[in-house]
Amino acid sequence: MDICVRPVWAEIDLDIIANNMKEIRNLVGEKEIIAVVKANAYGHGALDIASTLLENGASRLAVAIITEADELRDAGITAPIMILGYTPINFAENLINNEIEQTVYDVEYAKELSDFALKLGKKAKVHIAIDTGMGRIGFLPNEEGLNKVLEICSLPGVEVIGLFTHFSTSDEKDKTYTYEQFSKLTAFNKALEDNGIHIPLKHASNSGAIMDLPETYLDGVRCGIISYGYYPSEEVKKENLKLKPALTLKTNVAFVKELDEDMYVSYGRTYKTEKKSKIATLPIGYADGYSRLLSGKAKVIIKGQFANVIGRVCMDQCMIDVTHIEDVKIGDEVILLGEENGLKFDANDMAEIMGTINYEILCMISHRVPRIYKKNNEIVKVINYI
């Protein structure tokens, strides 16, 4: 791929992203859709993905850290953006001036935000997190938590935009715990209402709940992995959403050689040829997000066939056995993650090998890997991060 700084790239089909979001919009109806684009939009590239999601049904965005929000604002995105995690108070002026909605789960922090906002003659917009069973961040849904949230709602420099929780098991078949979490949130909100507090945007549904639990939608939903075409688990009702992965990871063959029988490949001599073999070297490794855990286990698609990754994956390179494939040469295109002509090796397959989840596979693709964006099968943009 001549338009990239190196022969490794991720192709992102923006039409597929658009279709995934339209599917989500059709499912949730008129509810607010908060599209989660943290971690560089799960490895897809936040700027172009965010715009596409907003154009096709999303009304809001969510990120994890202040720099992710700044990137979106600097690119001219004006849609509401919430930060799901912690932001140091020294960034308060940035939050307030850029109208970034900060998650709050500590009274003293909220007071400091309020003070900063009053000095600027503005209000800090916040979402209040309630820990209904994730055990991560948020006020506990008890009397003490209620009193703290009521105190935050009374602060003169704070505008409470949202109240939310995060489900920990909504992608599992047994929804009992998710229903318990949901009940705690709705009971907490009722207690606020009984105290004269109305928060306009209540949201709890993540990808698993969006697919399986429409009764948890409240005022809005937060879609993450499903925007990118992957299901959160194998236990959700896939028939509720027709999704397609938008990202394909590709490279070109960098070298081809023949090795005699009983010759070793890569570090540690973990692979030895059993016969005369043809080995191709690919210019991608674990520094690119192609994990060392794939050593000797993954496969790629080349010339319409599968080829096995052999030996240990190196920092910048790995090797495949192409003995069974004719006429493999330098420059041939290889699919490391994706599908072609009925052959598939995607983030789910990779995650199974590595003992992880498809989310991590996508997020691992590093900034060394250029992103190529396509619409109508035409390249519309290329990003070389480094």
From Swiss-Prot:
Gene: alr
GO BP term, pick one: peptidoglycan biosynthetic process
Annotated catalysed reactions: L-alanine = D-alanine
Protein known as: Alanine racemase
Purpose: Catalyzes the interconversion of L-alanine and D-alanine. May also act on other amino acids.
One GO MF term attached to the UniProt entry: alanine racemase activity
Pathways per UniProt: Amino-acid biosynthesis; D-alanine biosynthesis; D-alanine from L-alanine: step 1/1
NCBIfam families: alr
Source organism superkingdom: Bacteria
Keyword line: Isomerase, Pyridoxal phosphate
In-chain residues carrying the UniProt-annotated modification N6-(pyridoxal phosphate)lysine: 38
The UniProt record lists the keyword Ubl conjugation: no
HAMAP family: Ala_racemase
Active site, per annotation: 38 (proton acceptor), 267 (proton acceptor)
Cofactor(s) for this UniProt protein: pyridoxal 5'-phosphate
Positions bound to substrate: 136, 315
Family annotation (PROSITE patterns): ALANINE_RACEMASE
Database matches in InterPro entries: Ala_racemase (IPR000821), Ala_racemase/Decarboxylase_C (IPR009006), Ala_racemase_C (IPR011079), Ala_racemase_N (IPR001608), Ala_racemase_pyridoxalP-BS (IPR020622), PLP-binding_barrel (IPR029066)
CDD domains: PLPDE_III_AR
